[in-house]
Amino acid sequence: MYSVSSELYHEAAARLSDAIDGGNYFSGSLAFRFGDTDCRFTASVIVYRTRLSQPEGDAEPVSDLVPVWWEFHTFSAEGEMLNDFDFSEMKRFV
């Protein structure tokens, strides 16, 4: 089984954050290479935000991500590898 590292969680979270791009919902697939592993994250996610009012301006950072559905696949040269990806763990990096 492929063990998902904190670095891979960070990479997946960064790519998801970029794909959300200020929106309140994401549905799609993100494919990327991580080291010698090809990864594909497919999800439908509801994005909750918190409104922050500060002297330098307002912001609406992500306060929670609620997955409607998700899959995370990892592939090597030999084919697909089972992995221990956990959506809750990835949320810590968003």
What are these regions (language model features)?
Residues 30-38, 43-51, 76-78:
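Beta-strand elements of well-folded, non-transmembrane domains
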Residues 2-25, 29, 54-94:
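Acidic, low-complexity intrinsically disordered segments
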